[in-house]
Each structure stands twice: as structure tokens, then as C-alpha cells.
């Protein structure tokens, strides 16, 4: 099997990095259908609590059951993508998770007060090239620390 060229590797890294960022944005918008669509058909999501979610429908349903009045912001950094082949890659991302209660009154132009606890965690992702393009094949999310 021929290894990807440096240009091809850069394109794969960019596609996978965009998946990470789009997954955070879709999650924060509470657009769980769009979030699930970023996974492969048989994608697996492992969260810090609960059993693994297998398949897009299970991922979407689990996230859609979250409280609607919870505002979140997943701030992603240190996104490192490693290209394994022309069809697979893996990566890690640091995540700071902020949340707030949507029913709380905004504090002037500063928005709603954030919860006192900030969670810091990691995503470990495995990516694969599908007929629809690059998708998350497997994500393991874990918390490392909190305030």
C-alpha cells in the first residue's frame, strides 16, 4: 500500500481537524442530528459515563435526551492528527467544557453566568474515509480535571 504524500497528509489532517471542530459546534448548537452525521454509519462514541453508543441513531438519541436548558461551549485545543494511511487517521484533542443554565438571566452584555465548575478533558478519535468523506469512526471522551 502506498503511503500518502505530504500534500495528501495535510488534506487528511485538515479534514479530520474540521470534524473535531464541527462536532463541538454541532454539540453546542444542540444540533444532534448534525453531530451524529459526523460519525461513520457504525461509529462508536464512548462518553465519560454510560455505555458506548453504537451507530448514528444511538448517538443522536442519547444527545437529544440532554436537558434543553443547558448551554455548553466546548473549547478545543491541541488538536493533533496522525495520518495512518490514505483511509485512516487518529488524533487527540484537549477540551475545556463550560456550561450555563439557559433559563438564567443574562448579566448585561456579558451573557449568562457560567457554572462554577469547568471540566477539562480529551477526545481520542479514530477517523476513516467513507463514501461520504472523512468521518469519526470512534471517539473516546474522558475528563482529566475540573475546577
PLM features: residue spans?
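Soluble or luminal CAZymes and related metallo-dependent hydrolases
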Residues: 15, 73, 119
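Short beta-strand edge/turn micro-motifs at domain boundaries
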Residues: 2, 90, 114-147
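A solvent-exposed, acidic/Ser-Thr-rich amphipathic alpha-helical stretch
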Residues: 32-102
Amino acid at each position: 500500500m502506498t503511503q500518502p504524500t505530504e500534500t495528501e497528509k495535510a488534506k487528511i489532517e485538515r479534514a479530520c481537524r474540521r470534524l473535531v471542530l464541527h462536532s463541538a459546534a454541532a454539540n453546542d448548537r444542540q444540533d444532534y442530528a448534525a453531530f451524529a452525521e459526523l460519525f461513520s454509519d457504525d461509529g462508536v462514541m464512548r462518553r465519560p459515563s454510560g455505555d458506548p453508543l453504537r451507530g448514528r441513531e444511538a448517538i443522536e438519541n442519547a444527545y437529544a435526551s440532554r436537558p434543553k436548558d443547558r448551554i455548553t461551549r466546548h473549547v478545543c485545543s491541541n488538536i493533533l492528527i496522525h495520518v495512518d494511511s490514505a483511509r485512516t487517521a487518529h488524533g487527540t484533542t484537549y477540551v475545556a467544557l463550560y456550561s450555563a443554565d439557559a433559563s438564567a438571566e443574562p448579566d448585561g452584555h456579558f451573557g449568562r453566568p457560567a457554572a462554577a465548575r469547568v471540566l477539562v478533558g480529551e477526545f481520542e478519535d479514530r477517523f476513516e474515509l467513507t463514501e461520504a468523506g472523512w468521518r469519526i469512526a470512534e471517539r473516546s471522551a474522558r475528563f482529566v480535571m475540573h475546577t
